[in-house]
């Protein structure tokens, strides 16, 4: 048994987690890829030509638009992924990949983007997104997923966190320590431009990203806002905010680069585990208005590369958006973003993987029933920068 395999939850689109995984595959270019689902078109051909093994769910013709319907099947499918006889497995997980069954004697290192948010720290959000009759079934499903996570956490040899808030959640929910390796940003592809007067929102249009908060704050500040992204909230947002926002949908990389470079600022209204878009905007020399918690508080220097405001405060967000952003130095901002470059990520990731001991895992502390109860896991904890 020899060699190394790379595992990711599912490769259906090319967002932050998938771009991070793409950078991981460059560190080990000959390693096979194992994933629950794969869409070459949706991932813009980024993984074309690689040896990719998928789960049996691939036969169902699942896409980004309907894959959530298979949520109850993903844990079992993850456990049954055909890994092969490799002595090292590196998974990239936001929910399922860390639960794979590794070959006997293999070492499993998991790069964790976040514990599955709807099973842990955002249960209330998940319940609000389904009708009342379905909520008991969803509660049961999430309880089963927490049990799945706890079993997985006993088998993973080493977790790596993408930021302080993820590290805290890994320790609180699963009783594991995790070094931090910040996700990569392809900073070289961005350039500064002549800023316009609009602010920009970039992200999946789902409730936990709070696009409505960004639009309302921009309207209160008298700012134009352009919204990049698609998702289940798109129709609702268009109906509610007609004339208050310009919805651009999904855009290609070149268009996104231009939008970043010409924006007055990027607005990030929610708490992110890392917040890739915040670093991308800074790489383009644009300041970021975000929440003083989570990943954005780790990547944005208040007053120098952006402005940080309290969580959930629309008025504070609007007040920040009234700022004259031309006072920020685009050169200093883009230089700051280079500390999150792809090269820095890849070097650090390789160092951590190579340093992992093959000694049996020992829990850092016991996980009590109270810590895994719905009341406990629904509570949010600020990051310790």
Language model features with spans:
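Membrane-proximal helix-turn-helix segments that form the acceptor-binding/catalytic region
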Residues: 127-159, 167
């Amino acid at each position: 048994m020899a060699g190394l395999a790379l595992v990711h939850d599912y490769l259906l689109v090319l967002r932050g987690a998938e771009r991070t995984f793409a950078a991981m595959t460059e560190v080990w270019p000959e390693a096979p890829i194992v994933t629950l689902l794969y869409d070459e078109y949706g991932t813009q051909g980024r993984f074309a030509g690689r040896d990719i093994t998928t789960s049996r769910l691939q036969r169902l013709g699942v896409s980004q638009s309907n894959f959530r319907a298979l949520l109850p099947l993903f844990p079992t499918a993850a456990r049954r992924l055909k890994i092969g006889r490799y002595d090292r497995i590196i998974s990239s997980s936001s929910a399922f990949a860390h639960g794979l069954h590794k070959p006997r004697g293999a070492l499993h290192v998991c790069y964790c983007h976040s514990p599955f948010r709807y099973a842990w720290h955002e249960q209330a959000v998940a319940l609000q997104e389904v009708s009342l009759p379905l909520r008991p079934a969803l509660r049961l499903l999430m309880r089963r997923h927490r049990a799945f996570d706890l079993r997985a956490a006993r088998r993973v040899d080493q977790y790596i966190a993408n930021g302080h808030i993820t590290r805290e959640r890994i320790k609180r929910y699963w009783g594991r320590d995790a070094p931090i390796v910040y996700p990569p940003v392809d900073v070289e592809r961005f350039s500064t431009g002549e800023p316009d007067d609009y602010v920009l929102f970039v992200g999946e249009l789902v409730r936990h990203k709070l696009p409505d908060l960004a639009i309302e704050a921009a309207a209160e500040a008298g700012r134009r806002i352009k919204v990049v992204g698609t998702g289940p909230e798109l129709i609702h947002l268009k109906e509610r905010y007609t004339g208050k926002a310009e919805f651009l949908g999904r855009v290609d990389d070149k268009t996104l680069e231009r939008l970043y470079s010409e924006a007055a600022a990027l607005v990030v209204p929610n708490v992110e585990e890392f917040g890739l878009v915040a670093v991308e905007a800074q790489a383009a020399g644009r300041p970021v208005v975000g929440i003083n918690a989570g990943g954005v508080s780790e990547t944005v220097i208040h007053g120098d590369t952006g402005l940080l405001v309290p969580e959930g405060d629309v008025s504070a967000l609007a007040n920040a958006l009234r700022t004259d952003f031309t006072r920020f130095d685009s050169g200093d901002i883009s230089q700051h973003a280079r500390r999150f470059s792809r090269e820095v990520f890849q070097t650090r990731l390789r160092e951590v993987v190579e340093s992992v001991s093959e000694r049996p895992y020992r829990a850092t502390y016991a996980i009590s029933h109270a810590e895994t109860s719905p009341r406990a896991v629904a509570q949010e904890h600020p990051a310790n920068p």
